[in-house]
C-alpha cells in the first residue's frame, strides 16, 4: 500500500497540471476563439485537416476527457490506498465539479461566448484546480511529513558578537588600486544586485501590459524615455533599499553564515558612509521617478520605506508572516511599471502585482528551508524555524497554487496569447515538479532546486508578458 501512495501523489499532481492547462487555454482569447469555431457538442462537424480552429477544439475536448479520466483514476487509487479523509473529501469536490465544468463548456460551445457561461466556466475550472492542489498539499503532508520537528530556536545557540572587532583583511593593507576596487565592489554589494534583474523585469512587464492596454495589442506605444526613467529609478530604489537593509541588519548579519561577509558586517565600509550612499541612491531614484509622474514617485518612496523600515525592522524580526506580508514590497514594481505608462491604476496592473505577491512565499520559503538554522541564529521567526519544515513545504504548495490561479486570472482579463499560456502551464508544471521532489527528498539541494524553479517560472512568465503584450 505504501508503494502505491507516491503513484497517487503523482496522479494528483498530473491532474492539477492537466486541469490548469485546460483552464488557462480556455481563457486565452486566441485559443478560445479557435475553440468557438466548433459550435456543436460533443463532436465537431467538418474536416479537421486544414481547419486550425476545429483542430484546437478537438484537442481541447479530447484533453478534457483524458484529464477527467485521470482525476477519476486518482480518486480510485486514493480510496484503494487509504488516503486520509480530508484528501479524499477535497478530491471529491473536484470530481463533483468536473461534470459541471463539462456541461458549462457544452453551453458555451452551443450558445457562444456572449453569455454568462464563459465566466462560470473559468471560475469552476479554477475551483477544480484549487481542490486538486489542496488535495495534493495534504497528501504530500501525510506522505512525507514528520511529527517530531521542534522549533530550531530551541536547539540552536545564538552566538555573541563583538561589534568592535573587525573581520576580514583590512582595506588599508591593500594597494591603492586594490583598495579602490575593493571599496567600489563593497558599495556595489550593498545594492543587492541579484534582486535587480527580476524586479526590473517585473516593472518592464507592467509597462508592456499597460502599453498594450492603452493602445491595443496590435499597436502598443511605449516611449523610450519612460522605459529608461522607470527602470533607472527602479535600479536606484532597489539599491537604496538593499543598502538600508545592510545598515539596519549589520549586527544580525555577523551571526549568520550566509551574511557574515557583508561589507558593513565585516567593517569594509563605515556605517556613516553606507547610510549616506543609501540616501543618495534614494534621492536619485525619486528624482528619476518624479520625471515620469508623481504617482510613480510616491510608489517608489513607498517601496523603499516598506522594505527598509516595515519589512526589515517590523515584520522580519517579529512575525512568522514576514515573508507573506513582505511580498507587498516585491509587488510594487508591477504597479510602478503600469502607472508609469497609464498614470493610474487598473485591473491588469493590480493582477500582475497580485501574481508577484502570491509568488513570493512560494519562492522564498524554499530559501528559508535551505537556511533554516542560519535564520534561527539570526533570531528571525521564519516559517521553518517557528512551524517546522513540513508546514513550510505545505505552504509552498498552497502559494504555488494561488500563484497559478492568479496567472490564470491574468490571461482572462488581458489580451495575452498562446506564449503566455504555454509558459505559465509548462513552467508552472516544472515548478510543481520541483516542489513535489522537495517534499520527497527533504534536502537542502531539493530546496535550492525548487528555489531556482520558482525564479525560472517568474522570469519566463514576465518575459512572455512583455513579448505577448508588445507583439504586433
List each language-model region with its residue ranges.
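Solvent-exposed interhelical
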Residues: 34, 49, 247-280, 284-285, ...
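Small-residue-rich segments of transmembrane alpha-helices in multi-pass membrane proteins
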Residues: 201-204, 325-342, 390-391, 451-464
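Extracytosolic (periplasmic/ER-lumenal) interhelical loops and adjacent juxtamembrane/interface segments
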Residues: 34-55
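Haloarchaeal acidic low-complexity proteome signature biased toward cell-envelope/secretome components but also
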Residues: 1-31, 76-97, 123, 127-198, ...
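Transmembrane helix-loop-helix
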Residues: 66-100, 275-317, 398-452
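Helix-coil boundary and interhelical linker segments in multi-pass alpha-helical membrane proteins
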Residues: 207-231, 284-298, 333-354, 408-420, ...
Amino acid at each position: 500500500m505504501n508503494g502505491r501512495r507516491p503513484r497517487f501523489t503523482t496522479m494528483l499532481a498530473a491532474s492539477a497540471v492537466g486541469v490548469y492547462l485546460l483552464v488557462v487555454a480556455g481563457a486565452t482569447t486566441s485559443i478560445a476563439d479557435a475553440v468557438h469555431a466548433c459550435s456543436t457538442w460533443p463532436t465537431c462537424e467538418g474536416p479537421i485537416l486544414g481547419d486550425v480552429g476545429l483542430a484546437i477544439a478537438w484537442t481541447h475536448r479530447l484533453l478534457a476527457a483524458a484529464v477527467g479520466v485521470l482525476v477519476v483514476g486518482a480518486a480510485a487509487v486514493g480510496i484503494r490506498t487509504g488516503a486520509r479523509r480530508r484528501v479524499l473529501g477535497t478530491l471529491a469536490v473536484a470530481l463533483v465539479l468536473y461534470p459541471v465544468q463539462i456541461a458549462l463548456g457544452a453551453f458555451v460551445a452551443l450558445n457562444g461566448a456572449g453569455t454568462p457561461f464563459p465566466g462560470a466556466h473559468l471560475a469552476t475550472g479554477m475551483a477544480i484546480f484549487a481542490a486538486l492542489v489542496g488535495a495534493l498539499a495534504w497528501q504530500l503532508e501525510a506522505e512525507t511529513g514528520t511529527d517530531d520537528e521542534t522549533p530550531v530556536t530551541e536547539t540552536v545557540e545564538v552566538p555573541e558578537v563583538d561589534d568592535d572587532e573587525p573581520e576580514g583583511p583590512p582595506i588599508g593593507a591593500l594597494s591603492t588600486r586594490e583598495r579602490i576596487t575593493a571599496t567600489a565592489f563593497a558599495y556595489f554589494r550593498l545594492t543587492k544586485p541579484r534582486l535587480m534583474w527580476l524586479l526590473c523585469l517585473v516593472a518592464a512587464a507592467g509597462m508592456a501590459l499597460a502599453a498594450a492596454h492603452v493602445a491595443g495589442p496590435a499597436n502598443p506605444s511605449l516611449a523610450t524615455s519612460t522605459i529608461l526613467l522607470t527602470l533607472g529609478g527602479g535600479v536606484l530604489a532597489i539599491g537604496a533599499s538593499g543598502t538600508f537593509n545592510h545598515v539596519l541588519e549589520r549586527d544580525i548579519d555577523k551571526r549568520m553564515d550566509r551574511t557574515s561577509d557583508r561589507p558593513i558586517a565585516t567593517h569594509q565600509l563605515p556605517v556613516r558612509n553606507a547610510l549616506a550612499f543609501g540616501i543618495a541612491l534614494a534621492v536619485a531614484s525619486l528624482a528619476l521617478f518624479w520625471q515620469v509622474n508623481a504617482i510613480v514617485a510616491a510608489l517608489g518612496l513607498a517601496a523603499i520605506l516598506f522594505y527598509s523600515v516595515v519589512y526589515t525592522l517590523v515584520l522580519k524580526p517579529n512575525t512568522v508572516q514576514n515573508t507573506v506580508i513582505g511580498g507587498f514590497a516585491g509587488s510594487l514594481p508591477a504597479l510602478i511599471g503600469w502607472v508609469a505608462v497609464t498614470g493610474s491604476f487598473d485591473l491588469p496592473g493590480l493582477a500582475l502585482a497580485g501574481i508577484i505577491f502570491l509568488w513570493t512565499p512560494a519562492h522564498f520559503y524554499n530559501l528559508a528551508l535551505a537556511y533554516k538554522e542560519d535564520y534561527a541564529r539570526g533570531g528571525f521567526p521564519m516559517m521553518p524555524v517557528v512551524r517546522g519544515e513540513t508546514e513550510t513545504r505545505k505552504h509552498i504548495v498552497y502559494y504555488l497554487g494561488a500563484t497559478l490561479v492568479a496567472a490564470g486570472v491574468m490571461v482572462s482579463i488581458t489580451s495575452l496569447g498562446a506564449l503566455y499560456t504555454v509558459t505559465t502551464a509548462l513552467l508552472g508544471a516544472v515548478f510543481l515538479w520541483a516542489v513535489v521532489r522537495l517534499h520527497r527528498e527533504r534536502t537542502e539541494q531539493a530546496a535550492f532546486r525548487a528555489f531556482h524553479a520558482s525564479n525560472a517560472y517568474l522570469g519566463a512568465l514576465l518575459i512572455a508578458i512583455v513579448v505577448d503584450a508588445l507583439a504586433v
